[in-house]
Amino acid sequence: LTRSRGLGDVYKRQLNNYAKLVNNFATKLKCKIIFEPGRSIIGNTGLLVSKVQFIKKGLNKNFIILDAGMNDFMRPALYDAFHKIIPITKNSSKMKSAIEFVGPICESTCKFGVYKKYQKLIENDFVAITNVGAYGSSLSSNYNTRPLIAEILINKNKFKYIRKKQNLQKLINS
């Protein structure tokens, strides 16, 4: 018997209810259950911090163009996956129309999320795309000749580079 697909991300489930259901099932069948936790362990551990490069005004919504692209984080492009986007600096001003967060790659799938209401952003503001710990790095690529971004491990008040940002020479040599 396989449940398949792992447990999923923490933000989409109620673990206690799930555990009770599985325990009842296992007790009745007198079987051993083995879990492959999937992205439930690290899915919510990563953030992709991105800078607002430009705001393009549209008729029905504005486009917030970030410096991160689909090559840096592919899940929204591949699976239409939702990842909450939070501003690094909060303010009380609101955008006047809906917004869509997009990347700088000229592809229709280089987008991260649509919000009907969001705080006002300006160029050079920073936002964080949440829950990118699972598959964020492993799905990243040099698509469109874009260098791989830096990865930083933060533990309390200390940080360490896991991977430094790829420079152009390393990109060409690879």
Question: For each predicted feature, which ranges?
Answer:
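Charged (often Lys/Glu-rich) extended helix/loop segments that serve as interaction or gating elements
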Residues: 21, 30-174
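Catalytic cores of soluble, metal-dependent hydrolases
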Residues: 8-9, 24, 28, 32
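Single conserved hydrophobic/aromatic residue that forms the stacking wall/gate
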Residues: 1-11
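Glycine-rich and small/hydrophobic secondary-structure elements
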Residues: 15-26
